[in-house]
Amino acid sequence: VLHASDGLSQLGQRAQAQPVDLAKTLHDGSRIAVVGAGPSGSMFSYFLLKMADTVALELDVHLYEPRHFCHRGPAGCNHCGGIVSESLVQRLATEGIALPDDVVQRGIESYTLHMDVGDVEIATPLHERRIAAIYRGNGPRNSEPLDTHSFDGYLQQLAYDQGATAMPKLVTNVTNDGEQMRVECADGSSADYDLVVIATGVNSRLIKTLQGQLSEYSPPEVTKTFICEFHLGKELIRKTLGPSMHVFLLDIPRLEFAALIPKGNYVTLCLLGDDIDDKLMEQFFSSPEVKNCFPGGVIPPHVCHCYPRINIQTAKPSYGDRLVMIGDSGTTRLFKDGIGASYRTAKAAARTAVFHGVAAEDFRKYYWPLCKKVDSDNQIGKLVFAIGSLVQRARFARRGVLRMTANEQKNPEIPPRMSEVLWDLFSGSAPYREVFLRTLHPAYIASLMWNLVAGNVPGKKPAAKQEPVESGNG
């Protein structure tokens, strides 16, 4: 939360810093171009203008975005599964960004983990509904008009309400003449700015053009994913999937994460891994665990699909003089909580620009440390997913994980150690470092070892197979 006294104090510290490059600081009338009005671009604009208000700084912010998030299908979609973690919902609320009911599709009450050895439902920690399923656009292609609003559109409007100017244009190039940045658009127009913020994500051609603008720039490393939408209707979704996000731990090479997410009349499927292709998808759709989630065991045709690329390695460096990259364009969390990373990078970049400056050295000192922290955590995340891949390939390990989780959910007296690890992995609610350290706890290791043995006793059925696990039982 921002206070005027805090802003004035930080501005005073900037003024006292020696030496000060006044040519690369923001002043009254400075022009800022934000390229991309997804979550990172909209939140940057919102935070920048809000922070500027605390120090009586008048800025002219132009938010470039050719798409309209009120449109259904590809024209308004931002290619994302649309899950917002509980911790992020709380952080956004403290910033004055309270997600209204017409933006949230439904609260996720639980996660249901599907494996070939059985299923188990994992209740929300403390039984609080703080996981939100959202549409990044305004619904799938050919869908009926929705009585909801786009999450991206909601954030975009917050930026406009704070004072940003809408620029419905496609940016094709960004250049630096030493004194200012120039933004060039597909319609032939161009404009000069004191700062350009790249928030396009990694599915934009603009990222490639930046390689020629920054001599040492390495763009984000990416991988291909798959997202599609199924139309089932609210009543059928209630009967088959319920208010639960269905996650699959299957022995399919290169598949790191798969989930079905209920949203109103639709169900979103997300497949994440190492370059998702037709062979992998065929294996996934043919598995009994997936088919059994649909009515009659038949997977209906999808009404909308895409193969978006996601950032799996931070761009280096993600800044330059009068230039900074945020969200997926710069750094994001591995596989999960991309919207949370957009929030953190947007706020850090805005704070740097207002209270320190827009030179490359300013971003190196005050913005880049956050990027490095996220990147370091992602390295631990890669280790966590590598361990998960071993579990996927080992049937005896899946039995142990199933038994340990099922017992925790049925007996409130048992500490939910495995349940909390899985919950935070699925939701992205905690850093990978924290999740990994929990798996090193002696009690966690002892319980897992015991359940690996007990879950593989010949002739004994897994606990979750014997009776359904209800979310209200612990």
What spans do the regions from the language model cover?
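FAD/FMN-dependent oxidoreductases across multiple families
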Residues: 8, 104, 143, 173, ...
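Predominantly flavin-linked oxidoreductase catalytic cores and closely associated redox partners
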Residues: 47-50, 157-294
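Extreme N-terminal leader/targeting segments of oxidoreductases
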Residues: 1-32, 47-60, 464-474
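Glycine-rich FAD pyrophosphate-binding loop
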Residues: 49-78
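Glycine-rich Rossmann-fold phosphate-binding loop(s) that bind the pyrophosphate
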Residues: 37-38
